Amino acid sequence: MKSWTSRPVPELPGSMPQLRLYDTALGRVVDVERQPEQSMYVCGITPYDATHMGHAASYVAFDLLNRAWRDAGVRVSYVQNVTDIDDPLLERATATGVDWRELAQSQIDLFQTDMDALNVLAPNHYIGAVEAIPDIVPAIEQLIADGVAYRVAGSEGEPDGDVYYDVETAGKRSDATDAWTLGDVSGLGEKEMLELFAERGGDPTRAGKRHALDPLLWRVARDGEPSWPGSTLGDGRPGWHIECTVIAQKYLPAPFTVQGGGSDLVFPHHEMGAGHAYSLSGVPLARHYSHAGMVGLDGEKMSKSKGNLVLVSKLRAAGEEPAAIRLAILAHHYRSDWSWTDAEFAEAKDRLKQWRAALDHAPAGSAAALISAMRDELANDLNAPGAIAAVDHWAAEAIRSGSDKSEQDTALVTDAIDALLGVEL
């Protein structure tokens, strides 16, 4: 699947110091190992309501990581999927009377346009779940052959043959120190897992499962649902978690550096994906797990069901500048839960004007200290609010000085804010 095209990233003198990142699985901030190439997988959208502010905040967060690595002079291999076949997509297509393929493509196109507008660097590989099915089928067959997946008999009108992952058996297969067991990524207890599993697409009460938390690997064909050839699995379509695992294992090293996504993906999605990966390869999926906070609206949870989604495309259609939208997102630390408000968006627009005005008075020799301060903040768990505060201080001092601008420093500050924060002045 074709991705959008990234804009060029300015090169700056010097480089990013040692990057430290909060690792969800470890529960603390850790050094991200220095190496000549870093790799990242960020879970993509299910294309039926793009791009709301929660989506935007998550992809902007990991765009900061991408930019920090690039500023450190390393190559970055970045993969993102798109879940272009899933129950919510099919349900929305049925409700609106639109073919699911047309709905998915229209929302993918809109998402990519929004990402380009927000200056989010494009992934090296942008892979749809549907195009990955030929790779997913043999992976599931391997899990069955290895005894960590099983078929479930039909009941209550459901057909025979759905395939599930056996979390208990999989977790006992190896006593290696890096082997996966249930809870390694999320750190949750079984009670919390069961609640979240039911809320986030799982089926804990499905008859015939060995364990309530066993996730679906392959859903055999049903009347009225799209399906694909599954070889020995029979026609059907893949479960959500196995899609990302197989895509990541095909396009990234094992283990890759960072698995990213919203905090609502910690469990079950990233937990189960880690299990699938270890069962398939005997190697952890990722070295680090990083998650962005949730975004609400005026203090309320933002959700499709509540009809209170703030869409990037609607803001753009209303004439709002994407750089201001991005700056409003960056005013919050990526791990924090926060709410989008008109007042804070107004602050972001005012900040953007202030920064641009300050460029007319950029003091000679001021850029180097600003760039160093921005780098120090971003190297500390992607502290964008700290980097913004550094620019605010520089801008206030520049305007206060009233000096004639230094062309060199104006160019350096403009490039730094673009390269490190992704905000174009």
From Swiss-Prot:
Where does this protein hold Zn(2+)?
C43, C244, H269
List ligand-binding residues for L-cysteinyl-5'-AMP: C43, G44, I45, T46, S58, N81, V82, T83, W240, G262, S263, D264, V295
Q: Which UniProt keywords apply?
A: ATP-binding, Ligase, Metal-binding, Nucleotide-binding, Zinc
Is Zinc a UniProt keyword of this protein? Answer: yes
Annotated EC: 6.3.1.13
Q: Where is this motif: 'KMSKS' region?
A: 301-305
Name what cofactor the protein needs.
Zn(2+)
* Taxonomy, superkingdom: Bacteria
The record's top EC class is: ligase
Motif 'HIGH' region location, chain numbering: 45-55
Instruction: Give the GO biological process terms.
Output: cysteinyl-tRNA aminoacylation; mycothiol biosynthetic process
Which reaction does this enzyme catalyse, per its entry? 1D-myo-inositol 2-amino-2-deoxy-alpha-D-glucopyranoside + L-cysteine + ATP = 1D-myo-inositol 2-(L-cysteinylamino)-2-deoxy-alpha-D-glucopyranoside + AMP + diphosphate + H(+)
The Swiss-Prot or TrEMBL record describes its family as follows:
Belongs to the class-I aminoacyl-tRNA synthetase family. MshC subfamily.
HAMAP family per UniProt: MshC
Q: What is this protein called?
A: L-cysteine:1D-myo-inositol 2-amino-2-deoxy-alpha-D-glucopyranoside ligase
Gene symbol of the encoding locus: mshC
